[in-house]
Regions:
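A short, flexible beta-alpha/helix-coil linker loop
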Residues: 10-13, 147-151, 188-192
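Glycine-rich phosphate/pyrophosphate-binding loop and the adjoining helix
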Residues: 153-249
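Short, structured loop/turn "capping" segments at alpha-beta junctions
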Residues: 116-121, 136, 177-179
């Protein structure tokens, strides 16, 4: 049973969010072809994670057996988000470009899930590269929308693109290598002209094709791997969704 973790970070509502439409399209397409798929929804736009503070840092860098109840509470949200991540085979992130970078809620999510002892280890005996990821084998799909254009390598705004490099730099915390990242982009949103319409059509087609290919890969593998359950929590996550129609637009 494949598991999708769908992370939406747009502050916009469904009818106005291009990235929400793309994540819904990916999820629907994938589930139509792999009907036993489990989908975990994490809506950061509606339920933004807490920012990391001194209490989080103190608790995270304290050995688990030495944490008091106050420290456990400080890490409770992080634990829930990491539990969701651990369950996932594919992580689908709806990531609009805000001021050339990622939305604050998405950055807060990365800060909550990038945690020593849960998603990475730290050992100075490794020399200048002491960090090693603890998760692996996941595929990362980034579905993005940009008001302007030309942010790809070689584009006229490549130097202003802090979103794609930022996600790629953190992907190892999610258990995805750089070779396991697929990014699909809608551009020209603020121009609202034929270029934007063409970009949307191309992105929609690419999303369907990618979801179809990845779902087919899982169906052909027939691995039968069992993933642990993730229950609904007060931060806006829910699991065990098998949508064929009616997903967010």
């Amino acid at each position: 049973m494949p598991t999708l973790l769908v992370v939406n970070s747009s502050a916009q509502l469904e009818e106005r969010s291009l990235t929400r439409k793309l994540t819904a399209l990916f999820s629907e397409t994938f589930c139509e072809r792999a009907s036993d798929t489990r989908v975990i929804d994490r809506d950061l736009g509606r339920f933004p994670p807490d920012f990391v503070d001194h209490r989080f840092i103190e608790a995270a860098f304290t050995e688990p057996g030495q944490r008091d109840s106050r420290m456990t509470d400080a890490l409770a949200q992080s634990d829930r988000l990491i539990d969701e991540l651990e369950c996932a085979d594919i992580v689908v992130i709806g990531a609009p470009m805000y001021n050339y970078g990622m939305p604050a809620a998405l950055k807060a999510w990365f800060d909550q899930v990038a945690r020593i002892g849960r998603t990475f280890s730290f050992d100075l005996s490794r020399g200048d590269f002491p960090i090693e990821p603890l998760l692996s084998g996941k595929h990362l799909v980034v579905l993005s929308a940009r008001g302007e254009f030309g942010f790809a390598p070689g584009g006229v705004r490549e130097a202003q693109n802090a979103l794609d490099p930022g996600i790629a730099a953190c992907a190892h915390y999610l258990g995805a290598s750089k070779a396991s990242i697929d990014t699909i982009v809608v551009e020209y949103q603020e121009f609202k002209d034929h270029r934007h319409r063409a970009s949307w059509e191309q992105a929609s087609k690419a999303t369907i094709e990618l979801a179809t290919r990845l779902a087919s890969d899982f169906v052909s593998l027939q691995s039968g791997t069992t993933r642990s359950d993730v229950v609904e929590d007060r931060d806006g996550g829910r699991q065990d969704r098998n949508p064929v129609a009616g997903a967010a637009s």
